[in-house]
């Protein structure tokens, strides 16, 4: 299993990061004689521009040049953000539109991240693991190989307080929809967490847990194979 960042390392990373309020600005006007700052990314024609820049840099430029701007639309989706989204260029996994994966998260080969899933800084998604729609892996939460994290489930994050232990999900675990795994919990290999369960204590390998709080109700050997199958075809990438 991949070694994840410590809470102290994540805290230091966030503290030291240059905070960013990026803007996307659409403007129409007469810009033929306007010189744009070198740190602006500018696209378009002499009378219509799309600009990518920081809010702190845009303000003085706008104040100096608003007389030549006829129309303006500004898009801003964050303020003083410390952690950008992860560059997925070299990620060998299936990641669907609308997933939010932050920098310093680890996505291993063959993983599947579905629409609306959130993977926070320091989290680890193991090889062949599927994180279903709207599921959340909080900071430092770690899954092993071939895990299924059901839709809407939450693996609690632990960055603050830094002394807390992260959630660890071992290999071949099935987590049902809308389950919650609290900080410090380890779910043993091959276990099944029922939909809607709230897991407050470690789960033994091969156990099936359900309820609030979750309790062992049987063993996975008592569950039909078809109900705990991990489908490799869903993890297949282009040949």
UniProtKB/Swiss-Prot annotation:
Substrates-to-products reaction catalysed: (S)-2,3,4,5-tetrahydrodipicolinate + acetyl-CoA + H2O = L-2-acetamido-6-oxoheptanedioate + CoA
Keyword Transferase included in the entry's annotation: yes
Pathway the protein contributes to: Amino-acid biosynthesis; L-lysine biosynthesis via DAP pathway; LL-2,6-diaminopimelate from (S)-tetrahydrodipicolinate (acetylase route): step 1/3
GO MF: tetrahydrodipicolinate N-acetyltransferase activity
EC numbers for this chain: 2.3.1.89
Function according to Swiss-Prot or TrEMBL: Catalyzes the transfer of an acetyl group from acetyl-CoA to tetrahydrodipicolinate.
Designated name of the protein: 2,3,4,5-tetrahydropyridine-2,6-dicarboxylate N-acetyltransferase
Species of provenance: Staphylococcus saprophyticus subsp. saprophyticus (strain ATCC 15305 / DSM 20229 / NCIMB 8711 / NCTC 7292 / S-41)
């Amino acid at each position: 299993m991949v070694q994840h960042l410590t809470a102290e390392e994540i805290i230091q990373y966030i503290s030291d990061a240059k905070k960013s309020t990026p803007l996307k600005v659409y403007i129409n006007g007469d810009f033929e004689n306007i010189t744009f700052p070198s740190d602006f990314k500018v696209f378009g024609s002499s009378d219509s521009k799309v600009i990518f820049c920081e809010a702190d840099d845009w303000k003085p430029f706008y104040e100096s040049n608003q007389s030549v701007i006829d129309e303006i639309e500004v898009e801003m989706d964050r303020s003083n953000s410390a952690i950008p989204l992860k560059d997925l260029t070299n990620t060998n996994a299936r990641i669907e539109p609308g997933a939010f994966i932050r920098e310093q998260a680890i996505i291993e080969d063959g993983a599947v991240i579905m629409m609306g899933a959130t993977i926070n800084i320091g989290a680890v998604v193991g090889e062949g693991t599927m994180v279903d729609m709207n599921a959340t892996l909080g900071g430092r939460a770690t899954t092993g190989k071939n895990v299924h994290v059901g839709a809407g489930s939450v693996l609690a994050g632990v960055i603050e307080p830094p002394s807390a232990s992260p959630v660890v999900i071992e290999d071949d675990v099935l987590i049902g929809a809308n389950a919650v795994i609290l900080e410090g919990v380890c779910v043993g290999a091959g276990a099944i967490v029922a939909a809607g369960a709230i897991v407050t204590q470690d789960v033994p390998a091969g156990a099936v847990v359900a309820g609030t709080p979750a309790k062992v109700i049987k063993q996975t050997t008592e569950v039909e194979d078809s109900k705990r199958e991990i489908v490799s075809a869903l993890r297949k990438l282009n040949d």
